[in-house]
Amino acid sequence: MRRNCHFVNEKARARSLYISLVRSLFESCSIIWRPTNQTLTAKLERIQKQAIKWILKEENISYSSCEVYVQKCKDINLLPLSARFDLNDLLFLHKVIYELKPVNLPFYLSFFNGQSRLRSCHLDNLSLVSSIHPKSTHCTTRTSNPLANTFFYRTYSKWNSLPISLREIKCPVHFKFMLKKHLWKSLVMPDAESSFLIDDDE
């Protein structure tokens, strides 16, 4: 992009080019192939860092600090790729749960039925529970177990962590809008939620 689109000076136009030409490649079927470890995620995140530097004309400025990078993402309303992958995962799971996709939950996931052996259980009727768990050995950890990295298994706990007021939203458009706000709020200061706009069409 830096070589072929060097003539683009407007931030909004440069941002649109990045979204349509680069980020769209990362988002194609990301619920299937998304990286599940920090090393691979960081490699993809570096591509977006370079793109943001190009958009903001700050190619000589370091974004090595996580706080700086998140702030730059916020300045041009681009979620960090790791959060964007979570967004896509949760949007798809939401459509499965509310039967907006012709896909069923796997056999090992079901909704919490109110019975728990734990005294302090924070699950509700929209929480998902798994009947199986990846086995951990000295050679296999939760993060390296194939089941732990599959879409439904890695996503159901993220779904449970969302506020129930968010999970109760059935409209996919409204859910996406509110989920973006929630993800931004988790990335920046709690009182910064309303200090920037979230495009509803991305």
Regions found by a protein language model. Give the residues of each.
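Hydrophobic/basic alpha-helical segments
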Residues: 1-202
